[in-house]
Amino acid sequence: MSDLTVTFEGAVATVTLNRPEVRNAFNDAMILEVTQAFSQLGARDDVRCIVLAAEGSAFCAGADLNWMRSMADYTHAQNLEDAGRLATMMRTLYECPKPTIARIQGDVYAGGTGLVAACDVAVAVDTAGFCLSEVKLGLLPSTISPYVIRAMGARAAHRYFLTAERFSALEALRIGFVHEVVTAGELDSKVAELAHALVNAGPKAVPACKKLLQDVAGQDITPELVALTVESIANVRVSTEGREGLQSFLNKRKPNWLIN
């Protein structure tokens, strides 16, 4: 059985982690499936938003224990290859040209926090707990660190990477790791509301804006960075979509890309 299910509703694709019996912990097979799913969906013109969801009581518990047991006997070269696959999954999710929403219905541990951090928007139920537990096992949250630190900030990361404390959904909201905390009954409606906003924005502007965010965030404001921002807006203004958006605004009509 596949470790994922992929469903579609209009222009929204939902990728659901489907290993509830192990709290959606990932192994090498699941890592490959997630990587392939986001790579393929990101290339589809009929998909404008991707929701990452999970079955069962937990969103993702990080690495599967059986997979970790097998890693105990790996050589350094094998560990490099294995960690490289995990890093590729995280980067594929982070760089997916389509906007992504993490629908967090339960606890998120270790590598699972990387999945959340690599998504553009994160919505969690108020009962969800979070934990970067790697140091308790003598390990490091290495491959997920670029994404988690960007999401929660370096100061919060110092605390939660080093102490491996469990923190609540409200704390995740306070430090900026998630954007919304809702009750279980409100989760789907909030995700649908955000997805609706994303699919009705300019379908070419959204991935361009996502790339802009990744290029600009955390960078020094240099002449080169300013030139990049000038070039990006100039390119968009003369594009077919940019012209349509501006004309629709000036003429007080809806743009032709809207989905009802």
What are these regions (language model features)?
Residues 1-55, 88-91:
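Conserved CoA-thioester-binding segment of acyl-CoA-metabolizing enzymes
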Residues 20, 123-128, 178-227, 240, ...:
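C-terminal long alpha-helix characteristic of the crotonase
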Residues 54-92, 108, 220-221:
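Glycine- (often His-adjacent) and acidic-residue-rich active-site loop
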Residues 61-63, 156-165:
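Short helix- or helix-capping micro-motifs
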Residues 90-137, 166:
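Glycine-rich beta-to-alpha active-site loop
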Residues 146-155:
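Hydrophobic, secondary-structure "cap" segments at the distal end of domains
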Residues 165-171:
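Acidic, divalent-metal-coordinating active-site segment for phosphoryl/phosphodiester hydrolysis
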